[in-house]
């Protein structure tokens, strides 16, 4: 792991390798949080000559880069600093540039466009560079935005597109560039297994997000259809949502996509993890104690480096679930 600190002063850009002054690094993300986070614990030892020579005065808004094996895995801005004691550590919390999309809002009136064009438009307005943007070729007839975050604008567009393509999408930062990818890609050449790298595994079932009835309404408010999971209703009672018909969208397919059964969640901790095990990807897990066997999708991840050891903690899901942001017709 290599950590670099970048700051601007008097028109110049200064870069320092501060790896020797960092005692631990935590790099994390989740599907719902969107922006990835890095926490670096910097040694606060004013009497240590090596640390003193670095002249560490890391400030809010300055850039931190993390490299592993020569590859850039994080490019983000310092948001806050927490000092533990006079001669202990200072922990800096950093977010990648997706945080700008989460913290900024806009007003737009889109028509006859696509999710990919909407993404490039709002990123250009926010001066965020774009990388690989998933092509949907799915036409969005109309979408009026009034004060939504830029992240929600993008995800509303891709949620609409997903109803036509059947795919799920996720936003990620690739360095300083925003990418939109098809969600759920399997981590290649890596397996989590109790005999190799799993140190702990937990299994949980929950119905907190259950939807077993979806009623379909037209633009006049009249019910025109329904999708239902009778066995789920019989066992758990009714958990109902509504779907309002949209032009160009198959209402039965869209309503079915809203159904949500029992969620099965898994937490796995392991050593010698793979850096591709991040929120949104899929990973194979084999653990006899919990009965886990097969492909699971990562809802959240935390990678920690300390004392030369890489520890990985993952929250897994049995289903590949998108961070959907529904566009309500009454927003028009």
Where are these regions (language model features)?
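Acidic, small/polar-enriched beta strand-loop surface segments
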Residues: 1-6, 10-12, 155, 159, ...
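Assembly/oligomerization scaffold segments
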Residues: 1-100, 188, 193-201
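Short amphipathic alpha-helical segments
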Residues: 54-56, 114, 118, 275-276
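Extended Gly/Ser/Thr-rich low-complexity repeat segments
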Residues: 50-62, 66, 104-110, 194-196, ...
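Well-ordered beta-strand positions in beta-sheet-rich domains
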Residues: 24, 72-77, 91, 105-107, ...
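Oligomerization/assembly interface segments of phage tail-like spikes and tubes
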Residues: 32-49, 89-98, 216, 264-271, ...
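Charged- and aromatic-enriched interaction segments used to assemble
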Residues: 82-197, 201-203
């Amino acid at each position: 792991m290599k950590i670099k600190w970048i700051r601007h002063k008097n028109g110049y850009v200064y870069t320092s390798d501060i790896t020797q002054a960092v005692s631990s690094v935590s790099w994390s993300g989740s599907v719902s949080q969107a922006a990835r986070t890095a926490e670096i614990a910097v040694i606060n030892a004013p009497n240590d000559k090596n640390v003193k020579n670095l002249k560490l005065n890391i400030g809010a808004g300055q850039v931190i880069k993390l490299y592993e094996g020569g590859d850039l895995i994080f490019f983000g801005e310092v948001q806050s600093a927490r000092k533990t004691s006079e001669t202990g550590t200072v922990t800096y919390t950093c977010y990648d540039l997706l945080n700008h999309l989460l913290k900024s809002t806009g007003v737009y009136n889109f028509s006859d466009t696509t999710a990919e064009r909407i993404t490039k438009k709002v990123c250009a307005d926010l001066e965020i560079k774009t990388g690989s943007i998933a092509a949907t070729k799915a036409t969005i007839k109309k979408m009026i935005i009034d004060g939504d975050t830029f992240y929600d604008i993008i995800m509303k567009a891709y949620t609409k597109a997903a109803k036509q393509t059947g795919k799920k999408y996720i936003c990620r930062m690739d360095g300083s560039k925003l990418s939109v990818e098809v969600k759920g890609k399997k981590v290649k050449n890596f397996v989590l297994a109790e005999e190799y790298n799993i140190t702990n595994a937990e299994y949980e079932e929950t119905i907190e997000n259950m939807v077993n009835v979806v009623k379909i309404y037209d633009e006049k408010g009249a019910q025109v259809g329904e999708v239902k999971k009778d066995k789920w209703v019989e066992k758990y009672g009714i958990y109902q949502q509504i779907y309002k018909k949209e032009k160009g969208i198959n209402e039965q397919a869209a309503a079915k996509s809203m159904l949500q059964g029992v969620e099965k969640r898994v937490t796995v901790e392991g050593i010698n993890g793979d850096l591709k095990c991040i929120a949104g990807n899929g990973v194979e897990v084999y653990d006899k104690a919990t009965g886990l066997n097969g492909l699971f999708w990562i809802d959240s991840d935390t990678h920690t480096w300390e004392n030369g050891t890489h520890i990985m903690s993952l929250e897994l899901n049995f289903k590949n679930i998108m961070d959907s942001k529904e566009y309500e017709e009454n927003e028009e």
